[in-house]
């Protein structure tokens, strides 16, 4: 955070999204662990009336319970369910899509692709860590897994849009794309840096 941004916080009110009536809307929010953007997104959308499905690699039932208790304490009728999802695992992604179709019907108004990982915050990795199917771990999770999930749920989104007039995919990103290096996409000899790789993934999500 810049000094200018820090000082600005003392004089300018934090902007909040305008409340939207989401009654009857069905929303999936990936990566909803407590304390995350996904968790607060799910809580806000549920407060606005949406039926929300949250995902996580962790204990989803505990996340759902925490959301329900928090919403009920705020006087909101909780409409939150959840299911495990590991974007690093292609079968987990397909299983979630099957579960959603079987348990949540033929409607999906919004898919919020929030889940992502960065497991090398201190940039100590000298070589890429690979997923079980041979992809760089962050690429497999943040990009390939997200694209697969979107592709598998896209028919429901299209159907919902045709029937109800609107449906959308929201990809959550960050400013880390500014650390990307385009030449790394074409130069196989470029040394590995997890932050630059993460930035390239974030840049790809914006295309």
Question: Where are the predicted features?
Answer:
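N-terminal membrane-anchoring alpha-helices
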Residues: 1-13
């Amino acid at each position: 955070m810049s000094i200018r941004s820090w000082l600005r916080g003392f004089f300018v009110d934090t902007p909040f999204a305008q409340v939207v009536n989401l009654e009857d809307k069905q929303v999936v929010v990936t990566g909803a662990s407590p304390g995350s953007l996904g968790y607060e997104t799910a809580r806000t959308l549920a407060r606005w009336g949406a039926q929300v499905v949250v995902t996580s690699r962790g204990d989803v039932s505990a996340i759902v319970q925490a959301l329900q208790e928090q919403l009920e304490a705020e006087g909101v009728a909780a409409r939150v369910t959840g299911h495990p999802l590991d974007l690093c695992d292609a079968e987990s992604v397909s299983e979630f899509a099957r579960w959603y179709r079987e348990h949540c019907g033929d409607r999906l108004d919004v898919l919020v692709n929030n889940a992502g990982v960065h497991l090398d915050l201190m940039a100590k990795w000298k070589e890429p860590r690979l997923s079980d199917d041979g992809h760089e771990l962050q690429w497999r999770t943040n990009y390939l897994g997200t694209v697969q999930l979107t592709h598998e749920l896209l028919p429901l989104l299209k159907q919902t849009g045709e029937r109800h007039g609107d449906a959308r995919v929201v990809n959550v990103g960050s400013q880390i794309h500014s650390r990307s290096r385009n030449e790394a996409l074409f130069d196989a000899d470029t040394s590995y840096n997890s932050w630059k790789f993460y930035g390239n993934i974030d840049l790809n999500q914006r295309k």
